[in-house]
Amino acid sequence: MANKIKAEKGLSTEEKFKEAARIVFTKKGYAATKTRDIAEQAGLNLALLNYYFRSKERLFEIVMIEKVQQLFAFMAPVLNNPGTSLYEKIDLITPSYIDMLLKNPDLPMFVLSEIKSNPERFGKMIQANNILQSSFMRQLAEEKKDVNPIQLFLNFLGMMVFPFIVKPVLQTIVPMNEDAYVQLLEERKVLIPQWMRMMLE
């Protein structure tokens, strides 16, 4: 077990549990994580964790929602920046998005589950309307006038997210350890902007 959350950080009890959950969920994945693991990581009592969050599912939901909001908090200024070109936006978003997903491998499945169970809440959470009206979407429309910009945006997003969704299947089909998988994604940081340029020609 990694070092416990230090008391001197000055975090509240709730924040200690959330930080511990981020560490353990990332390390072990949702299915293999037990609430006891999180309590031990936080250096706090299991009963206290149950008092604050009631269940592993609830804690996971809170932590992942914060991660989604952090992601789109980063993306929004990039998508809406009129001072950068379309290709500069693509070059900025691609590596940052992939790096974030590498640090939070359970996030794509959480997002899919959240979209299925509560699409309206998820749309509000990521401010979907702001994305559709962003400078990025306008630039896509201007660059490729004969294609709906939503099609291009879905391609862009899918090329980054899909490898994380199919990882378990991929590793059963292709002999691939974790290092090889990460290397595959490092290559996609370069390839995805190239593929987007080809689509936009």
Give the predicted meaning of each segment.
Residues 16, 20, 24-58, 62:
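Helix-turn-helix
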Residues 63-91, 130-140:
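Amphipathic alpha-helical linker/stalk segments
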Residues 72-75, 105-109, 123, 160, ...:
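Short amphipathic alpha-helical interaction/hinge segments
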Residues 94-97, 111-114, 156, 160, ...:
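Short alpha-helical scaffolding segments that buttress acidic/His motifs in well-ordered protein cores
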Residues 99-138, 177-185:
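Short secondary-structure transition hinges
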